[in-house]
Amino acid sequence: MNEKKVYSYEWAGRPLVIEVGQLAKQANGAVLVRYGDTSVLSTATMSKSPKPLDFFPLTVNYEERLYAAGKIPGGFIKREGRPSEKAILASRLIDRPIRPMFPDGFRNEVQVISMVMSNDSDCTSEMAAMVGSSLALAISDIPFDGPIAGVQVGYIDGEFIVNPTVEQSNQSTIHLSVAGNKDAINMVEAGALEVPEEVMLEAIMFGHEEIKKIIAFQEQIVAEVGKEKKPVTLFEIDEAIQADIKAACETDMHDAIQTAEKHARDEAIQAVKDRIIASYEEQEADDDTMKQVYTILDKMVKDEVRRQITEDKIRPDGRKLDEIRPLSSETGLLQRTHGSGLFTRGQTQALSICTLGALGDVQIIDGLGVEESKRFMHHYNFPQFSVGETGPIRGPGRREIGHGALGERALEAVIPDESVFPYTIRCVSEVLESNGSTSQASICASTLAMMDAGVPLKAPVAGIAMGLIKKGEHYSILTDIQGMEDHLGDMDFKVAGTAKGVTALQMDIKIDGLSRNILEEALTQAKVGRMHILESMLATLAEPRKQLSEFAPKIVIVKINPDKIRDVIGPGGKQINKIIEETGVKIDTEQDGTIYISSANEEMNARAKQIIEDIVREAKVGEYYLSTVKRIEKFGAFCEIFPGKDGLLHISEIQEERTKQVEDVLKLGDQLLVKVIEIDKQGRVNLSRKVVLQEEKERAEQQK
């Protein structure tokens, strides 16, 4: 495979070119994917021996290089640092459909790395990287039950679009990424503008039809250049040990799992495990045997939970399959914050805080695409105490960033337009208790927090997590999954939306894929659950508060002639900085002449507005002004008609009589009523006091 081979395919009207055999030849598998002008190098490597772990050590990285967009990194070091939020989300996007495709018991470490080396914003680098990752694994000697593929789907004017361009994405009401193998879907990530469930389902199935075509293209390449898969040692259960353990504790484990309360259940299960482990330790079992014991006990819990759900239709906490845990919510918990909402669902609890800021507080995103700004931000934090544990305290990890982004996508659809509500909005969700579905609880809490803050949301949003237990052709769909069901189940399908439709979807599965029927049933069941949660939330706070918090910034909007913006800013920002220094406000200007003034002090807002209006105020012919004499010359006096604007009162226009010297009539600081009689081509204002005196004289005569 040292010879370079090139394969091409027309993908959504753009060329998809795969190059194999030239680059990164020491990796187990490597391909260069060119999609339009986007180029991604994807590699797959595997350790030579299994790792002594009880899980599959897979790492998937999507890495952006700024040279791909012709940019040099900012800062002092001038090289890429920690991955961007987009890169982290793309890594998760690729990881999720790939992970279920490896054999059970596989413990060799696998790394899949996709480097974006050239970026064309109209040709999705994430989907190119997904195809590249799949192909790198499929042509390698690494055990992999692929290929898989992914596509982006848009929806414009009733039509679905594959891999929409930037312009098309801006018009689309659906932003869907879907992945799977040739038989079924195994990953969904979507944001939408309150789209009905039926349309979302059709979008997913439309995407799967396109996926099948890309997989067929990959299979041709694998058939020609794929390596023979390397034999690897898979961890297998010792059936004799499993039978002994099952006989010793099957009944006790069954009873422990049916304990309703989470911590009590965990303790009961652990007590059964500890008894079995102690018995083997007394027999001085070797390390391999103990490894079998730990694995078999975990498998027993998993199998028993799944059996109870699919056969007995009983969940660990005693709920029905479609039953939601007890709900409660509260707003206005924190006095000095702009808005707060507490949402509790069983033993899952999220407290969200909403902060309002000026438009200048937007987040600037400077990645591979054009520089963008983000006016709404949703951040998710998951401290260790939420599960009653200790652990290292670090910054947000991939999971926290992913959950925050999911909440942001769900809520973004209902954020009011800037013209209606000219604020930057940040919501921070603090998970205080966790027993599953924390990301959806954070969506509910953030909705309440924004309503408490007075954000005029287009509609309230609620989220719910659905689960699946599948045994052969039989399956059970679970509403509002808890932690154990998430961990031991086959699917985590999160659905968020309003009463009108879906605003976000995310699906992770641990099996090969899902059929249309299961997806349709899960979406229908999720809608029923979502409506129930919305009803509970609205009972706490029916609509957004009419007044903002007294501690929130108040924003005043001033519309001026766009040509006058330079006058407000002044040379080198001198004028605008002077206003900010004098009033303590924040000022943001737009190119269309809109100026936003913000501070918590309404008096200072009004003062700043007056200063700006005075700066941009224009004199009009025929208008009268009470002016102040600022400078006297031989030919007349310069009078200030309003702050920042002077006009010339010529010596001949001071009075009806002839004036020999200006000083005979006027002195500095005199205030006199004048009329604008002319504004010349250069914008100079000419004033007259004589006309004012004549008009006063005429009115006096008419009154006689």
Curated annotation (Swiss-Prot):
One cellular-component annotation, GO: cytosol
Keywords associated with the record: Cytoplasm, Magnesium, Metal-binding, Nucleotidyltransferase, RNA-binding, Transferase
Localization terms from the record: Cytoplasm
EC number: 2.7.7.8
Cofactor: Mg(2+)
Amino-acid positions noted as binding Mg(2+) in the UniProt annotation, renumbered to this chain: 486, 492
Alphabetized SUPFAM superfamilies for the sequence: Eukaryotic type KH-domain (KH-domain type I), Nucleic acid-binding proteins, Ribonuclease PH domain 2-like, Ribosomal protein S5 domain 2-like
PROSITE patterns, per database record: KH_TYPE_1 (PS50084), S1 (PS50126)
S1 motif domain location: 622-690
Chain ranges of the KH domain: 553-612
HAMAP family: PNPase
Role this protein plays: Involved in mRNA degradation. Catalyzes the phosphorolysis of single-stranded polyribonucleotides processively in the 3'- to 5'-direction.
PANTHER family in the record: POLYRIBONUCLEOTIDE NUCLEOTIDYLTRANSFERASE, POLYRIBONUCLEOTIDE NUCLEOTIDYLTRANSFERASE 1, MITOCHONDRIAL
Protein name per UniProt: Polyribonucleotide nucleotidyltransferase
Gene symbol of the encoding locus: pnp
